[in-house]
């Protein structure tokens, strides 16, 4: 399944014309197609995916427009008329992903991070830029691979190998998971190299057309592909990459936490012990906890390694839940497959004594990629007045889902999943919206330092 310049917006016509300038022809793209699947196998796995969601999800209608779900499921299934490679099957099945309105639900290539990593280790390449969406909706260069000249952060991306930006985004966003279109954009931006590889393949070298950020004619650059993966696509990120802290101008403490991964528990505990001890010793004016790049993980990490260090107030991250009973969570007397709905009135109480506890004002800076356990952290902090939330309305819904279960698809080996629990935030309100900020600060995804500087400036103006 390949794509070419077929959409005729002015931007894409410009891109196609520029790329048509005389240059040596690029190599044919190479793909990791995987095994070929028969029509019967494709239908069996698609039906298995749909049946698995119905059997495990406690209530699809909490997120999903069921009429759209039924229509799109039928359309995708009806188009399974012949054999496909596993890559093509994913591209086809994944058209249902956006309609699930939940980044905990959907279908992916199995272990795509590992597959990309192996591709690079065996001499392959990925696109030599990372991208982010600007506030005007344009796709901008975020970082550039070493050795690439003529392309700079902030440049507007026009095309890659003749594929116009509008065309690429239409193909990628129509297969992206996520609660909202804003989250889907954040998801695609951070996995742009993965989407590009599965849609358009690897050509080793890439023809990039960009418009400089400071306004001049579009320019075309041929560059060798990158040989390292963006942070969000690395199979195993280091603790040094995920966590950092420092003191900002004006004696404001800053702690960046890019994940609540269970395997980083000890590393996070070590960093936060050191950071909070420094913030306390410095008598910092305020503390910023930056979770803009944190897509979640395990709740105990933010509870024990963050909240315990800045409050003694009891709190919770939910007030109600709906859960599907499975053999893994059943209590004696529960019926497997039944759905239970219950209020939640338990509270987590931080220890009364914490040698490194910080007692000043705390601001949690969120962004469009903040998700899952990070949203749970935000709503607990906001609804129990533990800290103030800064930024814009989150792209993820304030009432999250969780306890994600895998749906076995034995024919294709594709990776499908769905959550078995849906939470209501502590306030019981606002489930159809993101988390609304207490301190509105414009989010600049292209130049993230500007957002942090703006919050730092706002805090200093308050005292």
Each predicted region: which residue ranges?
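Flexible, low-complexity junctional segments that flank or bridge functional domains
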Residues: 26-287, 291-304, 308-322, 398, ...
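Conserved acidic, small-residue-rich alpha-beta core segments centered on
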Residues: 299-451, 457-458
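Position-driven detector of the extreme protein N-terminus
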Residues: 2, 22-24
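Compositionally biased, intrinsically disordered low-complexity regions used as flexible
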Residues: 1-2, 116
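Secreted/luminal cysteine- and crosslink-motif detector
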Residues: 6, 17-18, 432
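Bacterial N-terminal signal peptides that target proteins for export
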Residues: 3-14
């Amino acid at each position: 399944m390949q794509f070419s310049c077929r959409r005729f917006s002015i931007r894409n016509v410009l891109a196609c014309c520029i790329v048509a300038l005389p240059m040596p022809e690029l190599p044919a793209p190479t793909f990791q197609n995987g095994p070929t699947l028969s029509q019967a196998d494709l239908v069996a796995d698609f039906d298995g995916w749909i049946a698995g969601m119905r059997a495990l999800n406690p209530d699809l209608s909490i997120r999903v427009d069921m009429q759209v779900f039924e229509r799109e499921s039928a359309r995708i299934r009806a188009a399974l008329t012949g054999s496909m490679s596993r890559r093509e099957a994913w591209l086809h099945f994944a058209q249902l992903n956006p309609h699930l309105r939940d980044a905990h639900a959907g279908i992916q290539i199995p272990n795509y991070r590992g597959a990309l990593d192996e591709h690079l280790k065996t001499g392959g390449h990925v696109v030599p830029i990372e991208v982010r969406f600007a506030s005007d909706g344009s796709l901008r260069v975020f970082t550039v691979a070493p050795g690439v000249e003529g392309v700079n952060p902030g440049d507007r991306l026009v095309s890659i190998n003749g594929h116009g930006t509008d065309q690429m985004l239409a193909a990628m966003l129509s297969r992206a998971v996520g609660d909202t279109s804003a989250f889907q954009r954040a998801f695609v931006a951070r996995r742009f190299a993965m989407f590009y590889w599965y849609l358009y393949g690897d050509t080793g070298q890439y023809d990039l057309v960009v418009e400089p950020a400071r306004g001049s004619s579009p320019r075309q650059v041929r560059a060798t592909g990158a040989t390292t993966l963006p942070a969000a696509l690395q199979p195993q990120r280091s603790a040094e990459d995920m966590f950092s802290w420092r003191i900002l101008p004006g004696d404001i403490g800053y702690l960046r936490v890019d994940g609540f991964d269970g395997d980083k528990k000890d590393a996070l505990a070590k960093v936060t012990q050191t950071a909070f001890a420094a913030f306390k010793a410095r008598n910092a004016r305020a503390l910023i906890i930056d979770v803009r790049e944190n897509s979640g993980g395990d709740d105990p990490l933010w509870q024990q390694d963050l909240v315990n260090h800045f409050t003694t107030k009891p709190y919770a991250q939910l007030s109600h839940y709906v859960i599907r009973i499975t053999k893994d969570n059943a209590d004696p007397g529960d019926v497997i497959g039944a759905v239970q709905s219950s209020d939640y009135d338990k509270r987590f109480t931080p220890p009364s004594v914490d040698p490194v506890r910080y007692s000043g004002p705390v601001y949690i800076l969120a962004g469009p990629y903040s998700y899952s356990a990070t949203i749970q952290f935000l709503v607990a902090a906001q609804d129990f007045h533990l800290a103030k939330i800064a930024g814009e309305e989150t792209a993820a819904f304030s009432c999250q889902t969780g306890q994600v279960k895998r749906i076995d698809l034995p024919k294709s080996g594709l990776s499908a999943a769905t959550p078995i629990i849906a939470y209501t935030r502590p306030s019981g309100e606002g489930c159809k919206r993101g988390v609304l900020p207490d301190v509105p600060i414009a989010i600049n995804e292209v130049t993230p330092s500007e957002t942090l500087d703006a919050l730092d400036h706002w805090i200093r103006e308050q005292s």
